[in-house]
Structures are given as C-alpha cells and as structure tokens.
Amino acid sequence: MKFKDLRDFIDYLEQEGQLKRIKQPIDPNQEITEICDRTLRAGGPALLFENPIGYDIPILANLFGTPERVAMGMGRQDVKELREVGKLLAYLKEPEPPRGFRDAMDKLPVFKQVFNMPTKRLRKAPCQQVIWQGDDVDLDKIPVMSCWPDDVAPLLTWGLTITKGPNKPRQNLGIYRQQKIAKNKVIMRWLAHRGGALDLRDWMDTHPGEPFPISVAFGADPATILGAVTPVPDTLSEYAFAGLLRGSKTEVVKSLSNDLDIPASAEIVLEGYIDPNEFADEGPYGDHTGYYNEVERHHVFTITHVTMREDPIYHSTYTGRPPDEPAVLGVALNEVFVPILQKQFPEIVDFYLPPEGCSYRMAVVTMKKQYPGHAKRVMMGVWSFLRQFMYTKFVIVLDDDVNARDWNSVIQAMTTRMDPVRDTLLIESTPIDSLDFASPVVGLGSKMGLDATVKWEAETASTPSGTSQAAPDFDIETGTRNLLMQFPEIVDFYLPQEADKNSMAIVSIKKDAAGHATRVMDGVWSFLSQFTDAKFVIVCDDDVNVRDWNDVIWAITTRMDPSRDTLLIANAPIDSLDLTSPVVGLGSKMGLDATNKWQGETAREWGRPITKDPEIVAKVDAIWNELGILD
C-alpha cells in the first residue's frame, strides 16, 4: 500500500471502515479528547471532525488508534509484518556485504529499495497553496485542542519538527509537543537527548546568539509521520526511511523562510526560529503517564510564516493515562524493535513494552539463556543499545518458555525462579524522563533489572533438603477478613493465582502518612507467615484495582523510583523446597511501594492525576449514540 499524502490515507481508511466522519459541531476544548478516548478504548476508527466549534478547519484525530492502522500507515497489511520493517532497520544500522551470489540475490529487494531513499525536491507543492506571513500569522485560526481541564493552554501535538545541525549532512524529523502562548509563538518542549535538541545545542555552539531555523509540518503522508517516531539509525534521514516504507521517494519542497525541506504534501506548515535566549514556562499538561507534568523552562519557537493547503486538515491527538494513541504506537513499534535488538543480541526471543507501563518505562524480555549472568548482560544491552530505552526504569528478563506478553506467565516465572535480593539489579543516578516525577531529581533516577530466568549451577548453591513442613491450610476469605481487622486502612488484598504457593500479595490502602506502605508490607508478611512464604508484596493506593495487572503495572511504573521505593529483606525464612533461594530454607523478600509519595518521601512536587470534567463527560454521553462511531 502506497499513500501519496494524508488524504489518500484518509480515503483508504474510509473505504475499509476504519474512519468515521463526525458532522456534528464538537468543541476542541476537551470534547474531542473525550470522544477519542472512548473510541480508542473500544478499538474504534479514526475520526475526522468536520465542524469543530469556532473553526473552519477540520480536525483529524485517533488516526493511529489501533496497531492495525499503524501497520497500514507503514504500508503493511498486518501488525506482524512490522517485524520486516525492523529487519530492514537492523540491516541499515549495520549493513553487511553479500556473502556470495545467493545472499546477494536474497538482499536484492533491499538493494532496490535504496533507490527510494533520496528525496525528490519540488518547485511547487500543495503545502504552500496558502501563505500567511507577518501580521497575518495567527494560530488562533487553527483548531488547536485543549485536552484536559487543567491544561494551561491549547497544545499542538502531531507536528513533525524539522531541524538541521550545523555539522550534520541530514535533516532531523521529530515530534515534540508545543504549547501555544501567542498568535505567533509556541513553546518547544523537547528532551535533551532528542534530535532537535541536539541540533539546537550544536547550533548554539557554532552560531552563538543567532536564531535557529525550524519548520513544523502537520498532516504529512503516513510514512513520513511514522518515520519520525521510528528508531531510525542516526546516519539515516527520516525522509529516506519514509521512502523505504512507501516504496517511492519522499517529495519535499524548500521552506519559504529557511533552507529546510518540508513534506510537499503536508496540510499545514509553521516556519520560524528559536531565539537561543528566549525561554518560557511550559505546562502543566495532562501527559501519557496519566498525570499533569511539572512546569519546566523551554525555548520559544517564533513563527514567521504559516503555509497550508487550500481547505487544510489539522492532525491532532491527546495524551493521557494508557491506553492513548502514543501507547498504541508503542505496541505497534514494539514489533519494529524486536529484530533490531535481535541483530545485536540474537539470544533475545521476544521483547515487549507493555502499554500500561507508559510504553517505555518497563520492558519484558525473553531469551535463550546460554551462561551464568546472561540475563544481566541482556538488561545492560536493553538500557544501552538504543537511546529509546535510556529512560526505561524496569527490565524483566525471562527464559524463552515464558510468554512476555502475558502477565500470568511472567508472574509465575518471577515467583518460581527468583530470589529477590540475589536476582535484582539496582542502578542509581541514571538518566530518567524529566516527566517522571517519581524520580528523586529531575532527569535523574534509578533503574531495576529482575532476573526471572532459571538459575544455572554457578548462580545458586541451594539444594533441596526435602524436609519442608506443610503450611496450614489457608482460607483466603477468612484470612482476608482477619487481615482487614488488623489493618483497617487496607481496601483490598489479593493473592494472584498465577503466583506460586501464594508467594505474592498485592494490597491497596488508604494511605495517610509517609512510610505507611512499608508498615503495611511488614504487617502483611507477618500475617502471611502463618500460612505461606510470600516473597513479593506490592502496596498501591486505593485508586488502583489490585486484581487488574494493567492498573498495578501502571502504578509501579509511575509512582516508584526503584531504589528508593523497594524494600529488600535478606535471610528471610523460605520454603526449603524453594530451589531459587541461595541457602536451603533461607532466602529473601521484596516489597514494592507503588503508592503516591507524601512529603518526607520525596523532595519533588508530586504529579496530580488527570481527572475528566464531569460536564464534558455528560455532554458527550448525551450525543454519543447520535455520533454512531462504533455502529
């Protein structure tokens, strides 16, 4: 499937029943977010809002709201085919010459695609049919969405930001959110390791004090959009990769105010510059973590020109607690990552970024273990091989007989193959996403690796004694009632069936003080010691459903700094038949404090969870059936 532009893709999706036109007037202030959130959670279609209230420009949203539509945008029929995209990227990252005639013939399709990598520059392009410049530049005429009740201002979300470093031969395309602060100004929020930020830093070194040129394109063709979110090698332009995906050269045109190439088929383009000395406070915004982020200082992007198609379409999205559109993109791009990792680490069988872990904060890896300590090498490889994973806080490594995408399978392996102290790797003072308020310092926190593989002889000296005493029968309902009498702050108590011999407990509490979670852990261990040896206890707040792994993993990845919030107890009594313990009958325990932190537990301002406006919810309730989105 080849899509020349966004409209070509829209037509295709509509023919396939994958796009719904919304003709009713809908407010871009939170109403579109509410409608898209319901649609995405139901696996529904892309949405084209033809009459956003107050504007004459339609809004396209939920475009990549299912992994299948991401695959379609990459020219594939099925999500599984995205592994082929990953294999292509793995080859481009480390190309190898043919090892003979047969290998050359096998690689011929790849070699042919190389002809689609150069861009095709046009003299005229649809994206420059309409031009605003000077005083005519007015972002208020574009239907920029406000997504959540406490968002500080409207937010531009799907723009492809085009930059070029002074010492680099290629342009960089990246997607960074932009807060509207004036008719001609937005705040450019990009992380320090991202391509645009690196280009700006190089520019400031070589052109101190001079304005840094930028162009931002909205509504490019799907291959170019997805090329900007795919982990292409640093030496490869996103435009070149889009040409490979599409099977034809990416058409570009020179910006009016600078030398940057922009997608010729884009719907709307913003051109301008960053003054290296101009900053503004960005945020707070409801983010993909499910919380409002902290206010941070970022550079201001001043817009000198706006160009667009006649009758343009504005492409937008929202971010919120998973699942959201970025989480869905993460699920699809997960398939691209696997072959890239396998080329460097062929022992890896599967690699999974669970969307409930905010797409990148947790990775689950299965492998063919080949020697003692192998799991820790894989952990280090995940954290260091691709910069996309430098902010991943938790890595769980398992054998290849475990299903990395099934929490029941993962938890069973953790409870039967781990001694928590021996098999946990904690690394402090590592790079962390600045949006992660759980870290002790902005941009700096800890990482945790869990080795849930079967241990080799050199990794454990334990041998079974065969003398374990049977624990008394444990009636869960009676036990839970007794526990709640001792700890009335406990809201729910759950022993997952997939955890071996009740060796994991998950508890939700009404937290009322710093250190409360640790006290509950101690109480749960003391109570359960009458019946079973619980190696793992997880404590969450009462807004978490402890019987839903999506909720629990979300709490762990958003509310924990691994080093600060993990309690490890060595030399604890363990079932003598537990072969994972270092000493017969003596092992270790792990407690995870996945609660919101109080003053005294963190020095940072804690995130506020996103909550919807009840009036907006009620308004959408009233028109939901009329919209007919899921019919």
Curated annotation (Swiss-Prot):
Q: In which pathway does it act?
A: Cofactor biosynthesis; ubiquinone biosynthesis
Which residues are in coiled coils?
Answer: none
Give GO cellular component annotations, separated by semicolons: cytosol; plasma membrane
Q: What is its EC number?
A: 4.1.1.-
Q: Which organism is it from?
A: Photobacterium profundum (strain SS9)
Where is this protein found?
Cell membrane
User: Recorded GO terms, molecular function?
Assistant: 3-octaprenyl-4-hydroxybenzoate carboxy-lyase activity
Annotated keywords: Cell membrane, Decarboxylase, Lyase, Membrane, Ubiquinone biosynthesis
Top-rank EC class of the record's enzyme: lyase
Supply the InterPro entries for this chain: UbiD, UbiD-like_C, UbiD-like_N, UbiD_Rift_dom
Q: Which family does it belong to?
A: Belongs to the UbiD family.
Q: What is the name listed in the Swiss-Prot or TrEMBL entry for this protein? A: 3-octaprenyl-4-hydroxybenzoate carboxy-lyase
> Which proteins does it associate with, and in what oligomeric form?
Homohexamer.
NCBIfam families reported in the protein's UniProt record: PRK10922.1 (NF008175), UbiD family decarboxylase (TIGR00148)
Check the record and name the SUPFAM superfamilies matching this protein: FMN-binding split barrel (SSF50475), UbiD C-terminal domain-like (SSF143968)
Function as written in the Swiss-Prot or TrEMBL entry? Catalyzes the decarboxylation of 3-octaprenyl-4-hydroxy benzoate to 2-octaprenylphenol.
Gene Ontology terms describing biological process: ubiquinone biosynthetic process
UniProt-annotated stretches for the region Unknown insert = 452-593
Q: How does it sit in the membrane?
A: Peripheral membrane protein
Q: Which residues span the membrane?
A: none
Please list the cofactors this protein needs. a divalent metal cation
